[in-house]
């Protein structure tokens, strides 16, 4: 099956409680078998997804392989992450190698492996370490058969017994010895070691594996054509991970590859002697342990397959034929191991992944009880426009329908968790096909059973009747076994829904200064997701713009300083200047200006001269005398030259300043005798200074 599209199928089932097993887990140890390379080799691909509402942190390593490989990634619900490993990690020939691949995760995940080469591709759903076992039986087609065993613990010993009844059984040459039909070889493995076996012309169907410690087992064909008289020669890689024998069952049915009319092969392999096989309610044949019977079933022939002892049922899609109308969209062989009816879950999700060369025509085949088909949801919608066909001979009143689905992710589940169903994914394109079970429970329904108390959705056969989680918590005997609510399915799936938005927060603005922001939140609580329900889609928070009408405070700012102003017109004084808080003035409760509104300092305004004699600056009035210095500025003019010192510096009696006549006794007492002289002297000084001004 060369890949153009590969469907990656994720099982969405209830969390395993109390030891339940399914194809979801937190640790996987896998291997990849030999493929036929044509041209440039392609890397191995791993796809991982989760049904947890908490993102899963995933690490992939090749612990023993050289060169070693390690990569980490995170995947959230509803998404798929792809990781690539070198094609050299594939097994080759018949040998023990160090090619185990380990995957660990912080949450339960579903893992898919894709072994892809040009025109030779297949994929498989991986089983976690807690769901694998000790005993297996193999199924392959008739040539280029391969199988691989991967050790999960040190000191593992596996006894491999080749089929003694397979008409096309093969031989194995290992460590210089050749083993053929009915013979047993022993292989020793440590953790992460692999044993790979290849036969170019034989068939390993019916080969038995028994191990002392749990092992992972892969089976299929390197590249093979699944032919009948009408088919062509196109071939493909086939691979499946093998379920342990203790998970096999007794209740199956046939289905058909969509978009084909050439029919399909089914092989039924017994795990115990005297196994009676019935088709559509009638005995068909009896086979012994590790024998198989093969059915060539025409397209559209849906019928039950039942047995009195556990069997493994495999489906081989045929190579495209020359028959008119067969494979209008192409097709190649494909290989699936069908789950037994008790292992069906009630909730799946699957997604298609495109390769560069084009699209598959993608299909989902559903088999469900007729009474439950109307409770089915595909992408949250009730299916319509499909034809439901009964399964002949089914005691469960099963019906089959095929849904064509677009590329992308899809979810299909039943609103009643006790109503389980089969989901098989198919795809056809030119020289390409794929098919495998969308998911499976892996409960040990074929092993010893001890009755236990039920926990809803625990994936455990609590009442040891070979069925799992078949009752609803309703006080009714749903399965008709005389007991009530003894093996409970999970409660109905509840998808999360957003509650109303909370109040908006305060605007980031406190005043009208532009556009601000605000936020609000909501919770996924109306209802909250429960019972494997999907979390709310979208964000629990949002922001929006906002404005405020309140004017913003305006803080005051100082205006310019005024000119300096001396407090005295002459002599020593106090120099001051001031400024106003008006550039701008504070508004709307804005802060006042900080600092002082005035500044001061000492100043000298110049010599205080007489206003009449020598005082051209007119610092004193015309009736005053300006002292030259000292603390007194001006005195009455009549006190100058009166023989009494009035200015502290004596300048009012100084002939050079006041113009007093030196000849006058008593320093020029102003007694009337000197008045005219003084006046004339003063006039003389005035005129002298006036001439200087001119």
Residue spans for each PLM region:
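Short cysteine/histidine-rich zinc-coordinating motifs and their immediately flanking basic loops
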Residues: 524, 581-582, 640, 645-646, ...
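N-terminal signal peptide
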Residues: 10-24, 687-694
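Cleavable C-terminal sorting propeptides in eukaryotic secreted/cell-surface proteins
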Residues: 669-694
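Sec-dependent N-terminal signal peptides of Gram-negative exported proteins
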Residues: 8-9, 13, 642, 680-686
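Sec-dependent signal peptide recognition
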Residues: 2-9, 674-679
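Thrombospondin type-1
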Residues: 492-632, 637, 649-664
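Intrinsically disordered, low-complexity linker/terminal regions across diverse proteins
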Residues: 2-3, 14-454, 464, 480
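Extracellular calcium-associated, cysteine-rich motifs in secreted modular proteins
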Residues: 449-494, 631-639, 643-659
């Amino acid at each position: 099956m060369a890949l153009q599209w590969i469907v990656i199928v994720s099982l969405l089932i209830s969390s395993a409680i109390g030891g339940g097993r399914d194809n979801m887990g937190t640790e996987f140890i896998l291997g990849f078998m030999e493929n036929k390379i044509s041209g440039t080799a392609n890397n191995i691909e791993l796809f991982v997804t989760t049904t947890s509402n908490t993102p899963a942190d995933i690490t992939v390593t090749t612990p023993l392989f050289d060169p070693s490989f390690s990569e980490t990634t995170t995947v959230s619900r509803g998404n798929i992450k792809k990781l690539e490993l070198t094609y050299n990690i594939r097994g080759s020939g018949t040998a023990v190698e160090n090619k185990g691949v380990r995957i660990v995760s912080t949450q339960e995940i579903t893992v898919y492996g894709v072994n892809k080469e040009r025109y030779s591709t297949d994929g498989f759903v991986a089983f976690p370490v807690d769901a694998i076992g000790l005993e297996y039986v193999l199924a392959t087609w008739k040539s280029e058969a391969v199988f691989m065993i991967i050790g999960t613990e040190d000191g593992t010993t596996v006894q491999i017994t080749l089929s003694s009844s397979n008409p096309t059984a093969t031989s194995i040459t290992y460590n210089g010895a050749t083993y053929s039909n009915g013979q047993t070889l022993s292989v020793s493995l440590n953790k992460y070691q692999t044993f790979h076996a290849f036969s170019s012309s034989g068939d390993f169907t019916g080969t038995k594996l028994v191990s002392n410690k749990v092992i992972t087992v892969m089976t299929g064909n390197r590249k093979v054509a699944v032919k009948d008289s009408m088919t062509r020669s196109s071939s493909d890689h086939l691979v499946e991970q093998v379920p342990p024998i203790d998970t096999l069952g007794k209740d199956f049915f046939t289905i058909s590859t969509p978009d084909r009319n050439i029919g399909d092969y089914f092989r039924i392999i017994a795990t115990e002697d005297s196994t009676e096989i019935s088709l559509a309610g009638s005995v068909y044949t009896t086979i012994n342990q590790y024998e198989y019977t093969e059915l060539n079933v025409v397209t559209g022939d849906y019928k039950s397959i039942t047995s009195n002892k556990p069997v493994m049922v495999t489906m081989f899609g045929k190579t495209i034929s020359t028959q008119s109308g067969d494979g209008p969209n192409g097709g190649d062989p494909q290989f699936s191991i069908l789950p037994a009816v008790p292992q069906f879950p009630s909730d799946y999700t699957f997604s298609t992944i495109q390769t560069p060369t084009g699209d598959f025509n993608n299909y989902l085949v559903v088999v469900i009880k007729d009474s439950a088909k109307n409770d089915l949801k595909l992408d949250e919608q009730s299916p319509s426009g499909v034809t439901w066909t009964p399964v002949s001979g089914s005691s469960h009143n099963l019906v089959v329908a095929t849904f064509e689905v677009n590329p992308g992710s899809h979810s299909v589940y039943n609103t009643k968790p006790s109503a389980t169903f089969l989901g098989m994914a198919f795809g056809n394109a030119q020289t390409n096909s794929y098919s495998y079970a969308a998911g499976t429970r892996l409960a040990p329904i074929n092993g010893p059973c001890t009755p236990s108390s039920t926990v809803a959705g625990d994936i455990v056969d609590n009442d040891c009747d070979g069925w799992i989680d078949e009752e609803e918590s309703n006080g009714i005997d749903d399965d008709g076994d005389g007991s009530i609510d003894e093996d409970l399915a999970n409660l109905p799936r509840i998808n999360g829904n957003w509650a109303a938005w909370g109040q908006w927060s305060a605007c980031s603005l406190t005043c009208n200064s532009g556009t601000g922001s605000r936020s609000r939140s909501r919770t996924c609580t109306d209802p909250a997701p429960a019972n494997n329900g999907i979390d709310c889609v979208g964000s629990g928070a949002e922001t929006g713009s906002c404005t405020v009408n309140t004017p913003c405070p305006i803080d005051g700012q100082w205006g310019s300083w005024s000119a300096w102003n001396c407090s005295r017109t002459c002599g020593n004084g106090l120099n001051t200047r001031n400024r106003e808080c008006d550039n701008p003035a504070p508004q709307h409760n804005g802060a006042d200006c900080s600092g002082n509104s005035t500044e001061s300092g000492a100043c000298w305004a110049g010599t205080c001269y007489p206003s009449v004699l020598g005082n051209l600056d007119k610092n004193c009035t015309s009736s005053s005398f300006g002292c030259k210095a000292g603390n007194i500025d001006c005195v009455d003019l009549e006190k100058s030259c009166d023989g009494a010192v009035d200015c502290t510096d004596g300048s009012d009696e100084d002939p050079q300043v006041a113009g007093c006549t030196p000849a006058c006794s008593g320093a020029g007492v102003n007694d009337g005798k000197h008045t005219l002289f003084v006046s004339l002297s003063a006039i003389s000084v005035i005129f002298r200074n006036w001439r200087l001004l001119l």
